[in-house]
């Protein structure tokens, strides 16, 4: 892509074809040389979750099914896609983030902004995120989160937060 910038000083089919063999180079070509979306550079960018996300943000400037599908191969990029590009929750991005307790918790907190069975189930794969899910999202006792934190370093914190939540409800 540097050849297109430094020598050709314009987009050409032969340089574009060459850069489309690498998702990062295709992304950079679309941003710096074509300066617009094209099906061939988008297809090449979608070989990588990172570059699909980057293409949607910087080239398409909007959500698309193909870039979202590629981003959803990574919980991290699925989360980023939902929060920065879609700017809303969707079944496909939620499913992708649920491969990670960390991103499931953050998706529930920052994207769904409410409890969801799928994100809670994923958060319950790790005692820290089960505890945080109870504290920040559910804000009530649930058997599944309790069973995850029971017998761990978060058990006492879980009990304390539940006592606090009960006191707040009474007052």
Model-derived segments and spans:
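Ankyrin repeat (ANK) tandem alpha-helical domains that serve as protein-protein interaction scaffolds
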Residues: 1-171
């Amino acid at each position: 892509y540097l050849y297109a910038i430094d020598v050709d000083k314009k987009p050409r089919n032969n340089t574009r074809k060459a850069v489309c063999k690498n998702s990062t180079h295709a992304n950079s070509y679309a941003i710096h040389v074509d300066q617009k979306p094209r099906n061939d550079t988008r297809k090449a960018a979608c070989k990588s979750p990172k570059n699909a996300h980057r293409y949607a943000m910087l080239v398409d400037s909007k959500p698309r099914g193909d870039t979202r599908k590629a981003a959803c191969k990574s919980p991290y990029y699925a989360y980023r896609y939902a929060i920065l590009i879609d700017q809303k929750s969707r079944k496909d991005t939620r499913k992708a983030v649920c491969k990670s307790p960390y991103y499931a918790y953050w998706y529930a907190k920052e994207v769904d902004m409410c409890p969801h069975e799928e994100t809670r189930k994923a958060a319950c794969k790790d005692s820290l995120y089960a505890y945080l899910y109870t504290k920040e999202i559910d804000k009530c006792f649930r058997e599944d989160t309790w069973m995850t934190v029971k017998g761990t370093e978060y058990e006492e914190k879980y009990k304390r937060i539940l006592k606090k939540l009960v006191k707040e409800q009474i007052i």
